[in-house]
């Protein structure tokens, strides 16, 4: 598996040089980790520990990564359920980590369930927007789009759906504004034990963007 954002390269190298570019999990020897290398001029491969251990230490390895970086535009998927008011609530998730079930597929599936549930409700008070894009850069661009189109004033709140596919306790990360109604709603509506995390801009997902000033 190629490390995300790897550059184009074609060369022959020794195992000593190659192993610096290989990523694996020593704890889960059959698992292949997901690694990205955003904005660095580098390359690499992800593999299982078992595969790594089977590699010859004396052979030469031919590396041929036929990759290219091309100018394009960021794609954002948006679906809207109109309510009686323009007061808008956003459900956000991302699809920028290929081949990952919990971190990637669970968010859009959960969003689809919420969409179908809200779609059946007549005379909705709020307008709901469902956003699917790339993590971090996606909501930054989308919020800028809303600002430029004078829609940012209508946003009342946002919920980020990520890593919701495991049969474990629900983790709920509160918004920066502790008194926001959504925090109170979540605490009352979750019908089983959950872990509440305080907002922390130094880590997390798209909550860093939706709860940040500006």
Report residues per predicted region:
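N-terminal hydrophobic/helix-forming segments and targeting peptides
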Residues: 1-209, 214
């Amino acid at each position: 598996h190629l490390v995300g954002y790897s550059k184009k390269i074609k060369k022959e190298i020794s195992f000593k040089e190659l192993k610096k570019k290989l990523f694996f999990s020593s704890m889960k020897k059959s698992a292949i980790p997901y690694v990205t290398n955003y904005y660095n001029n580098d390359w690499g491969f992800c593999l299982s520990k078992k595969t790594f251990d089977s590699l010859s230490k004396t052979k030469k390895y031919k590396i041929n990564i036929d990759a290219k970086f091309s100018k394009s535009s960021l794609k954002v998927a948006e679906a809207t359920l109109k309510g009686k008011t323009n007061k808008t609530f956003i459900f956000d998730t991302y699809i920028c980590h290929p081949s990952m079930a919990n971190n990637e597929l669970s968010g859009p599936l959960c969003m689809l369930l919420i969409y179908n549930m809200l779609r059946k409700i007549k005379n909705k008070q709020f307008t709901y927007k469902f956003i699917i894009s790339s993590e971090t850069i996606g909501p930054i661009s989308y919020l800028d789009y809303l600002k430029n189109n004078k829609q940012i004033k209508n946003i009342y709140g946002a919920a980020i759906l990520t890593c919701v596919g495991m049969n474990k306790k629900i983790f709920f990360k509160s918004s920066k504004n502790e008194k926001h109604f959504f925090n109170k709603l979540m605490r009352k509506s979750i019908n089983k034990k959950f872990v509440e995390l305080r907002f922390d801009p130094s880590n997390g997902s798209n909550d860093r963007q939706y709860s940040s000033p500006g």
